[in-house]
């Protein structure tokens, strides 16, 4: 970890995950994309949404207002990490130039031709590894590896091919949808080299990739996210307060059991 990342981690380690809402939607991962070097947010949200994110992020990384292909579902159509950002072919030249002008110079931006154009639904990544939809083009896989500087693997999350919708992981840990078999979760954890846990957001939604955004030192979930769900997010992404960091394995199993009971 470099000095700047260490400083950000130090700042973020005592914070809690924050609830937020884009207009009337709790799917914050649909309207925003958060990495360790930038945050993209859709146009047209409330001032409260922007101020909530900027209060946590703006002192450390740019919070950039943008559209992709004229849409606001920016979190679902692009994929990125601290090194790069990949956008679909529907991205206009003007939008591309705005992103290049707004993001740090160290971030490479690439526009790709891909049949599975909702890249955020079909790819999940951190700064080291990416999981891809099993049917993604080979050329796109190579671009993901090149631009983001990651190892790329085709995978499913508990039989779900939309890996970007059903999981979210950072360099600290990851959340997968609650019906993911334990053996699958263990295999993915080994592959990603980060701890994983199963959970939900927004009061039982298993679309965790759509319902939250997180990096190595901050996380934002929809307003409907319960205290139990929030506790899971804070622990697995290692952004909990010191008291919450004292949770042990028994606590984790209790939280998982509570989530499963809620869904049954």
UniProtKB/Swiss-Prot annotation:
Cross-referenced SMART domains: eIF6
Molecular function GO labels: ribosomal large subunit binding; translation initiation factor activity
Which SUPFAM superfamilies has this protein been placed in?
A: Pentein
Transmembrane ranges? none
Which InterPro entries does its entry note?
Answer: eIF6
A single Gene Ontology CC annotation of this entry is: nucleolus
Where in or outside the cell?
Cytoplasm; Nucleus, Nucleolus
Question: Does Cytoplasm show up as a keyword for this record?
Answer: yes
Provide the family line.
Belongs to the eIF-6 family.
Q: Tell me the subunit arrangement.
A: Monomer. Associates with the 60S ribosomal subunit.
Q: Which PANTHER family match?
A: TRANSLATION INITIATION FACTOR 6
The entry's protein name is Eukaryotic translation initiation factor 6
Q: What is the lineage of its organism?
A: Eukaryota, Sar, Alveolata, Apicomplexa, Conoidasida
Query: What gene does this protein come from?
Result: EIF6
């Amino acid at each position: 970890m470099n000095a700047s990342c260490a400083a950000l981690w130090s700042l973020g380690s005592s914070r809690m995950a924050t609830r937020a809402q884009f207009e009337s939607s709790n799917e914050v991962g649909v309207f925003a994309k958060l990495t360790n070097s930038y945050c993209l947010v859709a146009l047209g949200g409330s001032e409260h949404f922007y101020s909530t994110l900027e209060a946590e992020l703006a002192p450390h990384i740019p919070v950039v207002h943008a559209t992709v292909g004229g849409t606001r579902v920016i979190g679902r159509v692009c994929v990125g990490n601290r090194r790069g950002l990949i956008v679909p072919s529907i991205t206009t030249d003007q939008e591309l130039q705005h992103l290049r002008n707004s993001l740090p110079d160290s971030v490479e931006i690439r526009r790709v031709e891909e049949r599975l154009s909702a890249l955020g639904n079909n790819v999940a990544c951190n700064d080291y590894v990416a999981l891809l939809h099993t049917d993604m083009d080979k050329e796109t896989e190579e671009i993901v590896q090149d631009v983001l500087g990651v190892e790329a693997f085709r995978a499913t999350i508990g039989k779900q091919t939309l890996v970007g919708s059903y999981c979210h992981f950072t360099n600290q840990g990851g959340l997968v949808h609650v019906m993911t078999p334990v053996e699958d979760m263990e295999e993915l954890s080994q592959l990603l080299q980060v701890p994983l846990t199963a959970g939900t957001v927004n009061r039982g939604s298993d679309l965790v990739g759509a319902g939250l955004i997180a990096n190595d030192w901050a996380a934002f979930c929809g307003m409907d996210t319960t205290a139990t769900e929030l506790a899971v997010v804070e622990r697995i992404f290692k952004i909990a307060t010191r008291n919450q960091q004292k949770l042990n394995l028994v606590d984790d199993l209790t939280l998982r059991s509570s989530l499963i009971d809620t869904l049954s």
